[in-house]
C-alpha cells in the first residue's frame, strides 16, 4: 500500500473521530428513499428546466447512495450519488441545508454513503439533478475507492474484491443483474410448463450422476464419508419413479477439478426431468427455453459474443456425433470395426488416447479434439457412444450409441442430456462396466449405486432429462470471456 493511500486512510480516520466528537453517528441507521436514480429520471427527465421550476413544490424526493464525484468550492457544490440503478447529480448549497449539514458535505469523501432530500431541477447544461434541502451522512468510508478515471484495472483484484468491482464497474453490475434475470426467466419458463421445483441433498453417500472427481468430506457424528454432489441427476430420477412427473432443480454442484476460464470447482446447474418424453422433446425444450430467456432478458435472441453474432432465433443444427467427426476428419466411425484400426486412425490424426480406450472413448476423443471448438452457432450433437454414457438409453437401431445429446455454442458445451435409461438390469450392467474402468485407472468412472437400481426396479416411466451449466449460459448471454466474470465470488488461489 502506497504512502499516499496510507495518508488518505489516516485523514479519513481523523474525520471519523471529528464526527464522534460532534455527536454524529458516522454509521447511521435507516433512510427512507422515494426511489432509485432511474425512477427519478423516468419521472422527471421529461420536463424542461422551466417546467421543473413550476413543479418544484411537487417534486420532493429522497435518494441515497455512494458519493462517486464531488466538486465545488465556497458555499455550493455538485456531486454524483450512485445507487443500484446508476447515478444522479446532487447540488448542495449552504443557504439551503444550513451550516451543520453543509459542513458534513464539505468534509464528505468519495465513497461515503449519503442520504439527500430535496427537489428536482435541471442545470444550465440540462442535467437532471436533486437540489438538496437536507444532507445526511449514512456511512463513513474509511478507505479510498480506486481511481475514478481508471477504475479497478487489476483483473485478479476484481475477482478477489468483487465489492470494489461492483462499485466502480457498471458492466459488472449489469452482468450480475442479468444473471439473476436469466435464472428467474428459466424458472418462469419451466413453471409455466408445469414443472415442479424441488431441492435434493448436496452431500451424497455415493458420488454419482456424472463423470467427475468429487470433493470428499466427513460426517463426524455418523463417522461416515460423504461426497459433495457432482450432479443432481439421480435424486431427481428417484422423484420421477415416485410420480413427480416434471421436476427441476437449480443448485450448486461441486467437482474436484482444475480451474480455468470455463471451470470453477463449484458451479450452478439446472437439471430437469420429464416423464413420457425423449431426447428429441428435450432438445425442443432446450432450444425454446434458451431462446425465451434471451428474448426476455436481452430483448433479442441474436446475441453478441466475442465479436460474433450468435443466432439463437433460427432453428438450431442437429448432427449425429459420427457425422460431425466425419465432416471434420473424413473418418467414418460407422465403418471402423477393430480396436487396431481405431487406434491407428487416432495416431494418424494426432489424437492422444490411452491403451484402455474402447470404440466410444476414441470416437469421443476425435470429437473433442477435432470438432468441438468449431461449433460456433447453436448445434445439438447427438448419438453419443454407450461406453461414455452410462445413464443414457441405448439407441434401438444401433446399440453402440445412445439417445443422448449435447448442446454446443461458441465451441463450448452448454447442455447435456438424454432419454434416460430406465431398465434396471441394463443400468446395473453399465455401472459394473464403469467399475471395471475405475479399476483400470479411470478415476471419473461411475460408482455402483444399488439404491438407485432398487428405485428403477419399481419402474420409472420413459423419461427425458436435461442439464445446463448456468454459468456458461450466463457467459454467453452477457458476452463474458471467463467464468470468473459471471461468478460473484469465484475460487481464487490463496495469496
Swiss-Prot record:
It is found in: Cytoplasm. Its EC number is 6.1.1.6. GO terms for cellular component: cytosol. It catalyses: tRNA(Lys) + L-lysine + ATP = L-lysyl-tRNA(Lys) + AMP + diphosphate. The keyword Protein biosynthesis applies. Keywords: Aminoacyl-tRNA synthetase, ATP-binding, Cytoplasm, Ligase, Magnesium, Metal-binding, Nucleotide-binding, Protein biosynthesis. Mg(2+) 1 binds at residues 406, 413. GO terms for biological process: lysyl-tRNA aminoacylation. CDD domains: LysRS_core (cd00775), LysRS_N (cd04322). Coiled coil: none annotated. Binds 3 Mg(2+) ions per subunit. Its cofactor is Mg(2+). GO terms for molecular function: ATP binding; catalytic activity, acting on a protein; lysine-tRNA ligase activity; magnesium ion binding; transferase activity; tRNA binding. Mg(2+) 2 binds at residue 413. It comes from the Bacteria. Belongs to the class-II aminoacyl-tRNA synthetase family. PANTHER family: LYSINE--TRNA LIGASE, CHLOROPLASTIC_MITOCHONDRIAL (PTHR42918:SF15), LYSYL-TRNA SYNTHETASE (PTHR42918). NCBIfam families: lysS_bact, PRK00484.1. Homodimer. This is Lysine--tRNA ligase. It comes from Staphylococcus aureus. The lineage of its organism: Bacteria, Bacillati, Bacillota, Bacilli, Bacillales. The gene is lysS.
Amino acid at each position: 500500500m502506497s504512502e499516499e493511500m496510507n495518508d488518505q486512510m489516516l485523514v479519513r480516520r481523523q474525520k471519523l473521530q471529528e464526527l464522534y466528537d460532534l455527536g454524529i453517528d458516522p454509521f447511521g441507521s435507516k433512510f427512507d428513499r422515494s426511489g432509485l436514480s432511474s425512477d427519478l429520471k423516468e419521472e422527471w427527465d421529461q420536463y424542461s428546466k422551466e417546467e421543473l421550476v413550476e413543479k418544484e413544490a411537487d417534486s420532493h424526493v429522497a435518494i441515497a447512495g455512494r458519493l462517486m464525484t464531488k466538486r465545488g468550492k465556497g458555499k455550493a457544490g455538485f456531486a454524483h450519488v450512485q445507487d443500484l440503478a446508476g447515478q444522479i447529480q446532487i447540488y448542495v448549497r449552504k443557504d439551503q441545508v444550513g451550516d451543520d449539514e453543509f459542513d458534513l458535505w464539505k468534509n464528505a469523501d468519495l465513497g461515503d454513503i449519503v442520504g439527500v432530500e430535496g427537489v428536482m431541477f435541471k442545470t444550465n447544461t440540462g442535467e437532471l439533478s436533486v437540489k438538496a434541502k437536507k444532507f445526511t451522512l449514512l456511512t463513513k468510508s474509511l478507505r479510498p475507492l480506486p481511481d475514478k478515471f481508471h477504475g479497478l484495472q487489476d483483473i485478479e483484484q476484481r475477482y478477489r474484491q468483487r465489492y470494489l468491482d461492483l462499485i466502480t464497474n457498471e458492466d459488472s453490475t449489469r452482468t450480475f443483474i442479468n444473471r439473476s434475470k436469466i435464472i428467474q426467466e428459466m424458472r418462469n419458463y419451466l413453471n409455466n410448463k408445469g414443472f415442479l421445483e424441488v431441492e435434493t441433498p448436496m452431500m451424497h453417500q455415493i458420488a454419482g450422476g456424472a463423470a467427475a472427481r468429487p470433493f470428499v468430506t466427513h460426517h463426524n457424528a455418523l463417522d461416515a464419508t460423504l461426497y459433495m454432489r457432482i450432479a443432481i441427476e439421480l435424486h431427481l430420477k428417484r422423484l420421477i419413479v415416485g410420480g413427480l412427473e416434471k421436476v427441476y432443480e437449480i443448485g450448486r454442484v461441486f467437482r474436484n477439478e482444475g480451474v480455468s476460464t470455463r471451470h470453477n470447482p463449484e458451479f450452478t446447474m439446472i437439471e430437469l426431468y420429464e416423464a413420457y418424453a425423449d431426447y428429441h422433446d428435450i432438445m425442443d425444450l432446450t432450444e425454446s427455453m434458451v431462446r425465451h430467456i434471451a428474448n426476455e432478458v436481452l430483448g433479442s435472441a441474436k446475441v453478441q459474443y466475442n465479436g460474433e453474432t450468435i443466432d439463437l432465433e433460427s432453428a438450431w443444427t442437429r448432427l449425429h456425433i459420427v457425422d460431425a467427426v466425419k465432416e471434420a476428419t473424413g473418418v467414418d466411425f460407422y465403418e471402423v470395426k477393430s480396436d487396431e484400426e481405431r487406434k491407428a486412425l487416432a495416431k494418424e490424426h494426432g489424437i492422444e488416447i490411452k491403451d484402455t480406450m474402447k470404440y466410444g472413448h476414441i470416437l469421443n476423443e476425435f470429437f473433442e479434439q477435432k470438432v468441438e471448438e468449431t461449433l460456433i452457432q447453436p448445434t445439438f450433437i447427438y448419438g453419443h457412444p454407450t461406453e461414455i454414457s452410462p445413464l443414457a438409453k441405448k439407441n434401438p437401431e444401433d446399440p453402440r450409441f445412445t439417445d443422448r445429446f449435447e448442446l454446443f455454442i461458441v465451441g463450448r458445451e452448454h447442455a447435456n442430456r438424454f432419454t434416460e435409461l430406465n431398465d434396471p438390469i441394463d443400468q446395473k450392467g453399465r455401472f459394473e462396466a464403469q467399475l471395471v474402468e475405475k479399476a483400470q485407472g479411470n478415476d471419473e468412472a461411475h460408482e455402483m449405486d444399488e439404491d438407485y437400481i432398487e428405485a428403477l426396479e419399481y419402474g420409472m416411466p420413459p423419461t427425458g432429462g436435461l442439464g445446463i451449466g448456468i454459468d456458461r449460459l450466463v457467459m454467453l448471454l452477457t458476452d463474458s470471456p471467463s467464468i470468473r466474470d459471471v461468478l460473484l465470488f469465484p475460487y481464487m488461489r490463496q495469496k
